[in-house]
Amino acid sequence: MKATQTLIATTKELPKEAVLISHQYMLKAGLIKKLASGIYTWMPLGLKVLQKIQNIVRDEMNKAGASELLLPSILPSELLQETHRWDKFGPELLKLHDRHNRDFCYGPTHEEPIVDMARDTIKSYKQLPLNLYQIQTKFRDEIRPRFGVMRAREFIMKDAYSFHENSQCLRNTYNTMYATYCNILDKIGLAYRPVKADTGAIGGDNSHEFQVLANAGEDIICYSNGSDYAANIELATYAKPDLSKRVNSQNTIEKIHTPNIKTIEKLCKEMSFDIKKTIKTMVIKDAGGNFFALVIRGDHELNETKINKLDQIIAPYTLATKEEIFSIFNANPGSLGIYNCPISIIADYSAIAITDLVCGANEDDYHFTNVNWDRDVTNYQIADIRNVVTGDISPDGKGTLELTNGIEVGHIFELEDVYSKPMNANIIGQDGKSKPMLMGCYGFGVSRVMAAAIEQSHDENGIIWPESIAPYQVAILPINYNKSDKIKEVADKLYQDLLGDGIDVLLDDRGARPGVMFADADLIGYSHHVVIGDRLLEQGLIEYKNRKTQEKQEITIAELIKILK
């Protein structure tokens, strides 16, 4: 492609809301252009990257035995009403009416239409397993779209749905899709981790996220430095302490005056306590109106997902109000504790492991020291209710846990019959009986992975793409292209030779100043830069630069061809 035949729309202007590097560089490089809040035009260079990602995804899905189809983007309300998601989705569902006043929505996801298609066409176990996928534009009316295409309202996604007679068949396809997602991300060239994840609103049983490692990632993931254990922080757990090794304390409880101390941090600072000897007592109210005292170590944080999954809790829970707490304890938050606690206690394992702990006295401006479980507090339950922290022992006992940030680009689920059962998507099984098909669901954020790639690899000058998805593999940058016949002749021949070799190449024939050409090439992120100028050309040389390493070499064209091949 010649630069004059496409649209290179680099700019120095940035809107204030462009906070993430990926958002800034995609706008500056002219890859996208904002049309409305959370809605972007894919410019030629951006679309080229997007198409390369789509091609990798499509190639690996086809290799895995999946078949591509395309579902409508506009969905009738009747389908989502069958699964009760017409109302459950809330305001993120963009609803509309046609001229006959029938209700439709712009598809935020496509479980219902794929099940509708399957129940009309799949009748027997003999047609299974079947894995169908599409690459489709979706729309979710985010209240605050931000971070460019990372969290846009309109986005491009590959979503696949598999159908099965039994759980083992489903698990086999799930494992195939797990490996396929690894292949996709390996082929793109990104550093990532698959992690165990919560199924969330989609539902189902088994679930994994595929997280691209990046400092700007909104998700926190944990992994063991001694094994392959990895999980989203929502589900990450740790090796439980051996509570039988607790030392029996001979110290007696002491009540101390702690005026105006309402936080653990202030308590430890003013009273010289070790924060690991303190506990936090937080009061929650579940959906059934039951109150619980949740207890964790002073330096730990509650994990909402784990708490909502407890058998004792009717989800979802909320934090008790200050008024509710005072009516129960006759004390305010910041002074609560486990000694003589008037409500049920659920304590984290790490809190239970403390001997001679410090806690609130259930009386304003007072705390207790030397409180011990089983001696002073006997009515409690133990559960894993906290976020893991760096240094926790991995649950498999191999190594310790480390935390990092990630950007979720893929999520796979074992849905079982979450959608097929309410929609009566039944087959005749091998036993001759009718039963719901079991399903798997496999989502991959095609447009999001593009932003994730930029977040993972960039410098102060622009984007450093993995070569597999760079808009062009090679950029020929001739100085005085429109003024020097010799420069033009060499540049044109090299361009044609590279095209003939199947290399994705851009010839910058705009006649722009060298500084502009070089800056654009760095910003856009072409993988290999070839500068053709009079001085070196007299010696039979060109200047080659590798965008990733920044290494420059003065080499012959023959040597360049060897590098590129």
UniProtKB/Swiss-Prot annotation:
It comes from the Bacteria. Pfam families: HGTP_anticodon (PF03129), tRNA-synt_2b (PF00587), tRNA_edit (PF04073). One of its GO terms (biological process) is prolyl-tRNA aminoacylation. It is found in: Cytoplasm. Keywords: Aminoacyl-tRNA synthetase, ATP-binding, Cytoplasm, Ligase, Nucleotide-binding, Protein biosynthesis. One of its GO terms (cellular component) is cytosol. It catalyses: tRNA(Pro) + L-proline + ATP = L-prolyl-tRNA(Pro) + AMP + diphosphate. Disulfide bonds: none annotated. InterPro entries: aa-tRNA-synt_IIb (IPR002314), aa-tRNA-synth_II (IPR006195), aa-tRNA-synth_II/BPL/LPL (IPR045864), Anticodon-bd (IPR004154), Anticodon-bd_dom_sf (IPR036621), Pro-tRNA-ligase_IIa (IPR002316), Pro-tRNA-synth_IIa_bac-type (IPR004500), Pro-tRNA-Synthase_IIa_type1 (IPR023717). Its EC number is 6.1.1.15. GO terms for molecular function: aminoacyl-tRNA deacylase activity; ATP binding; proline-tRNA ligase activity. Consists of three domains: the N-terminal catalytic domain, the editing domain and the C-terminal anticodon-binding domain. PANTHER family: MITOCHONDRIAL RIBOSOME PROTEIN L39/PROLYL-TRNA LIGASE FAMILY MEMBER, PROLINE--TRNA LIGASE. Catalyzes the attachment of proline to tRNA(Pro) in a two-step reaction: proline is first activated by ATP to form Pro-AMP and then transferred to the acceptor end of tRNA(Pro). As ProRS can inadvertently accommodate and process non-cognate amino acids such as alanine and cysteine, to avoid such errors it has two additional distinct editing activities against alanine. One activity is designated as 'pretransfer' editing and involves the tRNA(Pro)-independent hydrolysis of activated Ala-AMP. Belongs to the class-II aminoacyl-tRNA synthetase family. ProS type 1 subfamily. Homodimer. This is Proline--tRNA ligase. It comes from Francisella tularensis subsp. tularensis (strain WY96-3418).
